[in-house]
């Protein structure tokens, strides 16, 4: 099971209410601030200003996998949570309004990463451990294609309909979902690409390499517009870039996570024209 915490105002993290009987703790799954589905919408709107209600903690039932959960993402419309896990390899979709599982699907191979291609769960792309990229629709598996090298990360450029696949190669593979075919790859100077991300503000694509470098691509020109080595000292020479994230306000700040556990921030507005 997973917890869904309320947003809003100032504060602390919600906790599950519990009582103890003969030394055995009993937890209230819904908590005292649970609002039944039949409560009037007007009443629910008034609760938005209730700080205690906003800090409530509710459980999403059945959000678990036999061995481990590998990825969790929320759909852009905020209505669904999609999770992948092992073993066996599978994905599950949960509806937040009902706090329960909507459906699950079993996969042939372990899911390395996945992307939500639309506003909800109706269009999904899965990068799997057997080098396959599996496209799913509401009714299930739609199409599958293999990339040349082992995939490591996935990103989607909604402006060009390009699905970007980072792999154990210097090439960033491009699958155009509108044309249904591979396009010319974006070539990086790194020997292999660990992670790829895209800014929702200006569309710049950033790749993190095994050599500790971050390289940015302009999807309009389909070429590199800048590259920087994130190693700040001789102690960081062997580090790899393992995580990237643009800020969601202006897109000028890029957070870079490394294999040695350090997080650095890069200002990249000079790359945006």
Language-model segments: which ranges?
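A short helix->beta-strand "capping" segment at the edge of beta-propeller domains
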Residues: 45-67, 95-103
């Amino acid at each position: 099971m997973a917890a869904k915490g309320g947003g809003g105002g100032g504060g602390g993290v919600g906790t599950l209410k519990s009582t103890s009987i003969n030394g055995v703790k009993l937890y209230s799954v819904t908590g005292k601030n649970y609002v039944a589905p039949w409560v009037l919408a007007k009443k629910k709107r008034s609760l938005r200003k209730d700080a205690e209600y906003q800090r409530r903690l509710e459980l999403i039932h059945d959000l678990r996998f036999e061995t481990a959960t590998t990825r969790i993402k929320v759909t852009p419309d905020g209505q669904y949570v999609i999770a992948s896990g092992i073993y066996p390899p599978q994905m599950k979709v949960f509806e937040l309004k009902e706090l329960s599982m909507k459906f699950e699907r079993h996969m042939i191979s372990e899911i390395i990463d996945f992307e939500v291609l639309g506003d909800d769960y109706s269009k999904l792309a899965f990068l799997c451990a057997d080098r396959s990229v599996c496209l799913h629709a509401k009714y299930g598996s739609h199409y599958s294609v293999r990339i040349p090298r082992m995939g490591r990360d996935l990103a989607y450029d909604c402006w060009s309909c390009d699905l970007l696949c980072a792999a154990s190669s210097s090439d960033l593979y491009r699958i155009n979902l509108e044309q249904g075919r591979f396009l010319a790859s974006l070539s990086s100077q790194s020997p292999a690409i660990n992670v790829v991300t895209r800014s929702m503000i200006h569309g710049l694509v950033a790749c993190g390499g095994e050599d500790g470098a971050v390289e940015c691509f302009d999807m309009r020109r389909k070429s590199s517009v800048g590259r920087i080595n994130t190693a700040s000292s001789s102690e960081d020479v062997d580090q790899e870039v393992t995580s990237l994230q643009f800020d969601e306000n202006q897109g000028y700040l890029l957070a870079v996570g490394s294999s040695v556990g350090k997080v650095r921030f890069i200002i990249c507005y000079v790359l945006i024209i």
